[in-house]
Regions:
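Residues at the starts of beta-strands that form the adenosine-phosphate
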Residues: 10, 55-57, 81, 108, ...
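Conserved beta-strand termini and adjacent loop/short-helix elements that scaffold enzyme active sites
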Residues: 62, 85-87, 133, 203-206
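Phosphate- and divalent-cation-binding pockets in alpha/beta enzyme and binding domains
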Residues: 21, 67-70, 99, 179, ...
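Conserved beta-loop-beta/alpha segment of the NTase-like Rossmann-fold superfamily
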Residues: 69-148
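Catalytic-core segments of class I nucleotidyltransferases/pyrophosphorylases
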Residues: 110, 117, 123, 150-238
Length: 238
């Protein structure tokens, strides 16, 4: 079955966090400029969306936002049209979207957390507005099966396919913004409310390349997997 084309929509990139767990790097640069294999996170993200035809972005930023703008302008915005929504104080994911909503004229738009690197196909989210991408739950701990106090099986850092976690990429409608707080996160306010109203859908990506960069260990693991999965070929080859 042919996959739907990406419509002419904008993508919000939520880049306002302080990245405290990535210190001391983020004492000097904002989290979106933290390099993964010598390429800043935000460059991976913009190039990722451009692979699917999205060339208009709203970057929601706060901490060291001028560095982000200067960096991208030096790269001629990677051939994209970029607008900036600046937060004077940290607004959370919901507040950031609400604050930047003035830049949106279209009925629907994409949102991506500012620490995600992935190859999942965002076009699949367009089948229904207010859809979130989900990937299999991962754990950083070993899991043990036990029968009568004997270990029968040991799983080192497994993927738990029966459970799914938020991948930090959404396709949202204008109407959902009425449920967003002026300050706060959509993950613990807007999404739970919309879920109870039956207004939130999920699209499963069981085999997607996906990393969330929250720690120095995440940088190391993502860097290795970019090489192992030839992710740079996916991003840079036409």
């Amino acid at each position: 079955m042919q996959k739907p084309r990406v419509l002419s929509v904008k993508a919000f990139i939520l880049s306002g966090g302080f990245g405290k767990r990535l210190r001391p790097i983020t004492d000097y640069v904002p989290k979106p400029l933290v390099p993964i294999n010598n390429i800043p996170i935000i460059e991976w993200q913009i190039r990722y969306f451009k692979k699917f035809g999205i060339k208009e972005f709203v970057i929601c930023s706060g901490y060291k936002n001028e560095q982000i703008k200067d960096h991208l302008e030096a790269k001629k915005n990677l051939g994209a049209a970029i607008q900036y929504s600046i937060e004077k104080i940290s607004l959370g994911t919901g507040g950031a979207i609400k604050n930047a909503f003035r830049f949106i004229d279209e009925p629907n738009f994409f949102v991506m957390n500012g620490d995600v690197i992935t190859d999942l196909d965002p076009r699949q989210l367009q089948s229904k507005p207010n859809s979130i991408a989900v990937v299999p739950l991962r754990t950083s701990f070993g899991i043990v099966d036990i029968t009568e106090n004997k270990v029968t099986r040991f799983y080192e850092k497994p993927t738990i396919s029966e459970y799914w976690m938020n991948a930090g990429i959404y396709y949202l409608s204008r109407e959902i913004t009425k449920y967003m707080p002026k300050k706060g996160n959509i993950e613990n306010s807007t999404f739970p409310l919309c879920a109870t109203k039956g207004r939130l859908s999920a699209v499963k990506y069981p085999k997607a390349f996906w990393h969330s960069i929250d720690s120095h260990k995440d940088i190391e693991e993502c860097s290795k997997n970019i090489v192992a999965r030839h992710y740079d070929d996916f991003i840079f080859k036409k």
